[in-house]
Each structure stands twice: as C-alpha cells, then as structure tokens.
C-alpha cells in the first residue's frame, strides 16, 4: 500500500505541475515571437513581468470557463492586475497548441495586433491553461502594461 501511495504522489507531482511548466515555457516563446514582430516595425521589445505573469495565468484559468474579456464575477478583465491608471491591454485566444500558432492568430487580428505592436506597452505577462474536457482545450492570455 505504501508503494502505491508513493507512486500516486509521484504521478501527481509530475502531471500536476506540467501545466505550470508549459505556461512558463510558452511565456518565453510568446515573448520572443512578439518581440520579433515589434522589431519588424521598430518598436522597443517587451519584458516579462512576474505580476503580469501571475495575473495572466489567473485569467487563462478563467477563460476556460467563460471565453470573454469579462471576468467570472462580471468585472473588467483588468481588475486582475494592479494597473492603477497605467496603459494596459489584454489579448485572449483559444484552440492552438503552440505559441507560434497563437501569436500568428493574434497578428491576423487588427485589435490583437495593435496591442502587440503598441509602443506604449513595455511589459507583458502570458498565461496558458489546458483543459482536456473543454471546448478548445488550449487557452492563452496576454496582458500588457505601459
């Protein structure tokens, strides 16, 4: 019985943290892709901000349930961040498994592309959530702040 519990605990640790590991890796991939797009038009690169990363991951889990810029409690999407009058933006996407496909999807949308290329933005957070039993499975959030 003890061996069984150890195996179960190991499986939980391995698979329970895989979504967080994926989110962290995807954030770096998205940052690199976004900064390449910004460089093409002469806009300064963004940097990842830890607080925006945390907020974007909260939003990614929220949009699994309700794919909207409105939070589950009915409040504005920006209430998840401490922006207090700063310039900010949010991009959401669903359905693509890779950072490349997701950034490409955003770049093919006028509104999302404007956020990515906005010169006033200096920081970004990227959130990712995977839910096997949901409509789109892969959920992405970008939060921007300037």
Regions found by a protein language model. Give the residues of each.
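Positively charged n-region of N-terminal signal peptides that target proteins for export
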Residues: 1-4
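Sec/Tat signal peptide C-region and signal peptidase I cleavage site
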Residues: 17-22
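A short alpha-helix/helix-coil micro-patch that ends at or immediately precedes a cysteine
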Residues: 23-66
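Hydrophobic side chains within well-formed alpha-helices
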Residues: 26, 30, 48, 52, ...
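Surface-exposed patches in mature extracellular/periplasmic domains of secreted proteins
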Residues: 40-54, 67-79, 113-129
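Short, surface-exposed glycine/acidic/tryptophan-bearing loops
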Residues: 54-100, 116
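Disulfide-stabilized extracellular recognition modules
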Residues: 94-146
């Amino acid at each position: 019985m003890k061996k069984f519990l150890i195996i179960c605990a190991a499986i939980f640790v391995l698979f329970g943290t895989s979504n967080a590991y994926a989110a962290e890796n995807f954030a770096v991939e998205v940052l690199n892709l976004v900064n390449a797009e910004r460089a093409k038009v002469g806009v300064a690169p963004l940097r990842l901000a830890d607080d925006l990363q945390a907020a974007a991951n909260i939003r990614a889990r929220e949009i699994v349930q309700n794919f909207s810029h409105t939070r589950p409690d009915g409040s504005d999407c920006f209430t998840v961040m401490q922006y207090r009058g700063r310039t900010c933006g949010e991009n959401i996407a669903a359905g693509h498994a890779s950072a490349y496909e997701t950034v490409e999807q955003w770049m093919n949308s006028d509104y999302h592309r404007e956020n990515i290329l906005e010169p006033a933005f200096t920081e970004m957070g990227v959130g990712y959530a995977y839910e096997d039993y949901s409509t789109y499975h892969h959920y992405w959030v970008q939060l921007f702040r300037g």
